[in-house]
Regions:
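Sensor-1/coupling segment of RecA-like P-loop NTPase cores
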Residues: 121-170
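Conserved Walker-type P-loop NTP-binding/catalytic site
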Residues: 10, 29-105, 155-165, 177-184, ...
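Internal alpha-solenoid helical repeat scaffolds
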Residues: 8, 406, 410, 414-462
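Short secondary-structure boundary elements
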Residues: 173-403, 408-415
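Conserved P-loop NTPase "ATPase switch" module shared by AAA+ and STAND
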Residues: 98-118
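A short beta-strand-to-loop transition that corresponds to the Sensor-1 phosphate-sensing loop
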Residues: 20, 140-145, 214-216
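Tandem amphipathic alpha-helical repeat scaffolds
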Residues: 142, 328, 365-370, 387-391, ...
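P-loop NTPase Walker A phosphate-binding motif
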Residues: 1-25, 29
Length: 462
């Protein structure tokens, strides 16, 4: 839009059309939408300069604009292909006439929803529209992840690129600096907006659509308001709180998921439970499908751009392209099924991969999420929370260690006296290291009372 606006300010005539998901079967709809306003703005003199056969052809898909104009006396051809070529030539002639006096930019958005007839006309215009005096630039946008493998747009693009008439351009995420600059200009604020800028950078990862939609949601919630051209709000508090996940973002992600095959969707749900980053072997082990089926599912996920290969900070095989994608897919899974998959992930991790330092917190997480399925799973969660806490304490991350121990004490089964003792004892040691004598004393008292309630066998165990 900025590109088109800049050209328009420089005198370029901008024609704008858009494809719509539920109107994709309407012939030539986006091109009709683009040409309609320019036709309506033509003077009688300008219309008079158009050949009557061109007026007749244009009236086929924009009848209201040219109603009452003289028609060509030529009889329609009995050959459908010839009629179509004559129609295409009429549209081409009109665009050529517009570009004779001025530069023309034709923008067609969301071509992944374009009907095949639209692409055929667009292909003709690109190859046959003469622009002797001023250039005609056609810009089309589409979402690659929304294209089926055999979508006609793919062949259309290859054909034009093959003859040097199309130049693909991929829009990359905004850089941190670009996001900051955008927010400074939009907000009319300077240093006050810095906390929100940093948070939105992390939350959106430079995705322009996510950025704009979250900002719109903050305004709709009156969390941010506008006064005298500048944003108003407690930006520190907003940046510390939970940002909204707008319905518009959910709908876009859900629509992308629903276009995939059922098998791929099933694998995708399991992957979302595994985490932002995941390994092929663990997906196979958890999903219980063979490697070939899993690879086919992953290929489809890659094609729809919901995941990337080997891009995560943990150097795992795959990573969701954006954490919002994983978040939305995770939320689409019913609670009971979600708990079941978490349990399957944890069991697979124990069975196929020996627990290591870097995995104990993941095992604790998965067993925590699955604990309501079976009380034994809560015991497993407490066991790995203890290990995760011990690892944190070993790395002098004492605050994290206490958090793990606290969580473990809330889920350890009442019957597991030894487990409770181990968690209390470990926490007491950390409190000692922190110099938190009151908390340490409380744990020592709790340990003494726990030992008094134990049987001889339980005392021997601890």
């Amino acid at each position: 839009e900025t590109f088109a606006k800049n050209l328009s300010n420089q005198g370029t005539r901008v024609l704008w059309g858009r494809c719509y998901e539920f109107e994709h079967l309407l012939p030539y709809q986006p091109i009709a939408e683009a040409l309609g306003p320019s036709l309506a703005g033509l003077t009688t003199e300008a219309i008079g300069q158009l050949p009557q056969w061109v007026i007749s052809e244009l009236e086929r898909f924009i009848p209201d604009v040219l109603a009452g104009q003289p028609k060509s006396d030529g009889k329609p051809s009995a050959n459908t292909d010839q009629e179509q070529m004559r129609f295409f030539a009429g549209v081409s002639h009109y665009l050529s006439m517009l570009s004779d006096s001025n530069r023309v930019l034709l923008v067609l958005e969301d071509l992944h929803w374009a009907a095949e007839s639209t692409l055929e006309l667009l292909h003709y215009l690109a190859r046959h529209t003469p622009t002797s005096n001023s250039p005609l630039l056609i810009v089309g946008s589409y979402r690659p992840e929304s294209l089926e493998r055999q979508h006609p747009l793919m062949a259309f693009q290859r054909q034009l690129q093959g003859v040097g008439m199309a130049l693909p351009f991929q829009l990359l995420p905004l850089s941190d600096v670009a996001v900051e600059q955008f927010l400074y200009e939009m907000s009319g604020r300077d240093k006050a907006i810095i906390p929100l800028t940093r948070r939105l950078n992390r939350e959106t990862e430079g995705n322009p659509f996510f950025l704009v939609e979250i900002i719109k949601a903050l305004f709709e919630m009156n969390t941010i308001t506008l006064k005298e051209g500048a944003w108003q709000g407690d930006f520190d508090r907003i940046s510390r709180g939970e940002l909204p996940l707008p319905a518009s973002i959910k709908e876009v992600i859900q629509a992308r998921v629903h276009r995939m095959g059922e098998t791929t969707q099933d694998a995708l749900r399991t992957a979302a439970i595994l985490g932002r980053e995941f390994d092929f072997d663990l997906l196979v082990a958890t999903w219980t499908q063979n490697e070939d089926i899993t690879l086919d599912a992953l290929d489809e996920m890659l094609r729809y751009q919901v995941i990337d290969e080997g891009t995560g900070i943990s150097n795992r095989d795959y990573a969701f392209r954006h954490h919002k994608i994983q978040e939305v897919i995770h939320s689409m899974i019913p609670r009971q099924r979600r708990q079941y998959i978490h349990a399957q992930v944890a069991i697979a991790m124990e069975k196929h991969f020996s627990p290591q330092d870097e995995t104990v917190s993941e095992l604790a997480h998965h067993y925590l999420q699955a604990q309501n399925l079976d009380r034994s799973l809560a015991g497993k969660a407490a066991h790995y929370l203890l290990q995760a806490g011990n690892l944190a304490a070993k790395q002098f991350a004492n605050v994290d260690a206490v958090t793990y121990y606290n969580r473990g004490l809330t889920v350890v089964p009442d019957t597991d006296q030894a487990g409770r003792y181990a968690l209390l004892s470990a926490r007491e040691h950390v409190y000692y290291a922190q110099g938190n004598r009151d908390a340490q004393q409380d744990d020592l008292v709790a340990l003494w009372e726990l030992v008094q309630d134990m049987t001889t066998e339980e005392q021997a165990e601890v």
